[in-house]
Amino acid sequence: MCSICVDSFMFENGERYCHVVNKDTGEPLYYPNLYITTQVRNRSESISTMKVIAGSISLLYRFFMRKNINIDERIQKKLFLAPHEIEDLIEFTSLNFRDGGDGNFRILNVKKPTKYFRITTVANYLEWLCKILLSHAGQENTIKEVMAFINNIKRKRPRNNDKYNMEIEKSLNKAQLDSLFSILSPGGNLNPFKEKVQKRNNLIFLLLHCFGLRAGELLNLRIGDIDFAESTIAIRRRANDKTDSRVYQPLVKTCERKLIADTKLIYEVSDYILNDRRKIKNSNKHDFLFITYKEGKTQGQPLSFSSYHKIVSIVRQSSSHLSGLTGHKLRHTWNYEFSKAIDKNQEISDEKEQQIRSYLMGWRPGSDTSIIYNRRHIFELSKKTALEQQEQLFKGGFDE
């Protein structure tokens, strides 16, 4: 079991922070944390970004520990990683460590974007470290040697890192949605959850489906964000919120916005708050919408990311139709259904559609993010158009 890990904590002013530590000694690693502070935190990056960068750097030092490499000493002597060591490092960045330490990683590798990010972060960190440790040796040859070393690492990044080259089937089809809400129906025989949490969990998926919310947006919702008279729900940004007890604070990455809610949905929210949430111990100490029900010291506290993912995992295992379920797939589903609804309304121009979609999803005006979420609909339209074109061809309907 490797002892290098990322530890997260919260300052008194509410700022979330993380650092790379040696679990055996409890000591933070000097250079990795200097890098995180000066190159990441001071650029005002979010805690989420800090954590993934720190995770990649901790992975690098786990590799060094495994290979018995003193990287500071090697750099000072200008004995950079040899080609075979770089190959070993690249292979190490491919491994999935989600299930434990060095001895417990999954055989399956991480996906290309994750590997690409890890290698890029490792290369950027090592370039910075070389400049720090060799600052006294500012000769042109030294700089060339360092950049050759860094470029040898960057060349190993996987190709085809196009963010638009994604699987078409990201959204759920009608059969999957029917299965999902049949399972989640409070009091239903198929419901895998205890009765006391069934309303809460059903509402979680209703909000994900109705608004295409991100997990951070969902877990960041407060009762005060809901206007029951106007039937609206506000999405608010609250980075480093001192009143949020969660160290891993759910963040809203998108723009703030106000969403209109159907009266039936507002009723479900109101019913949950008045007849369900209020019965839980400590629930009156804050107004975060979703809370922990499990008895113990965390009862009544805001629902954590880990609890949210556990809920999704239990639902995923409840039906073979939902084997690939993630909360984010409902965001793709919302976009697919939005595109179909727009197609039925011929009065809405493409420009207006883009504006409406961007607002409801919280994207900045002019963002090309919609291309990612709209791939399934575009694929179906292109398929329909191609088939109609071929049908005309076989009917002899094209002019010479």
Residue ranges and their predicted role:
Residues 42-136:
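Non-catalytic DNA-binding core/recognition domains of DNA-processing enzymes
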Residues 131-135, 208-232:
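Short, charged phosphate-coordinating catalytic segments
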Residues 138-184, 296-298:
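Flexible interdomain linker/hinge and immediately adjacent N-terminus
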Residues 182-215:
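Basic, Lys/Arg- and aromatic-enriched nucleic-acid-binding interface segment
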Residues 190-191, 309-359, 363-367:
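Short, basic (Lys/Arg/His-rich) helix/loop patches that form interaction surfaces
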Residues 220-267:
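Conserved tyrosine-mediated DNA breakage-rejoining catalytic core shared by Y-recombinases
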Residues 262-323:
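Active-site/catalytic core of tyrosine-dependent DNA strand-transfer enzymes
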Residues 361-390:
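Catalytic-site neighborhood detector that most strongly recognizes the C-terminal catalytic loop/helix
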